[in-house]
Design a protein with these regions (language model features):
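Hydrolase catalytic cores
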Residues: 60-144, 148-149, 153-156, 160
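Catalytic-core segments of hydrolase enzymes
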Residues: 1-67, 115-121
């Protein structure tokens, strides 16, 4: 976690795809920003892990990506593209938002970046988000965390802290 001249590195980690409580390695440090997956309807992806350690969700279904052809790849269509899913597909969205935040305000600490991502997440899916003890960045839900990440809102909030 150390780095950035004492501001700490932002670490995002996928919660896992077992449709159960978050476990190792996503639960090994409370400074990790844990990311679950959401589907195109704004609900928790059916296999995305959940629970007290969940911070946010990001799109985790039908994410286009590049791939290899042949026996080392999964691309059967021959066009170098395939769809990727699960919490490992959701996690890069959050890492990219953290990078965008730091591109407009590189003086933010890890804790501030995590807080911006969590506090600007959208409450989607019809879930009941409530004030929860220990969750200081707004209302929270055990299946969706603080909600679906919102890159635009996060960058705007980072700019306000300049």
């Amino acid at each position: 976690m150390w780095g950035r001249n004492g501001k700490e590195c932002i670490v995002v980690f996928a919660t896992g795809n077992a449709n159960s409580s978050i476990s190792f390695p996503a639960n090994c440090d409370d400074r990790i920003l844990t990311v679950g997956g959401s589907n195109s309807s704004g609900h928790r992806h059916s296999t995305s892990n959940y629970g007290e350690l969940l911070d946010v969700v990001a799109p985790g279904t039908e994410i286009p990506t590049t791939d290899l052809l042949g026996r080392y790849g999964s691309d059967n269509k021959g066009d170098y593209y395939m769809n990727f899913g699960g919490t490992s597909a959701a996690c890069p969205h959050v890492a990219a938002i953290a990078a965008l935040i730091l591109s407009v305000n590189p003086n933010l600490t890890r804790a501030e970046v995590n807080s911006i991502i969590q506090s600007t997440a959208r409450k989607v899916g019809g879930y009941n988000y409530t004030n929860t003890s220990g969750k200081t960045d707004g209302t929270w839900n055990r299946e969706m965390g603080y909600g679906l990440v919102d890159a635009h809102a996060a960058v705007l909030k980072a700019k306000q802290k300049l």
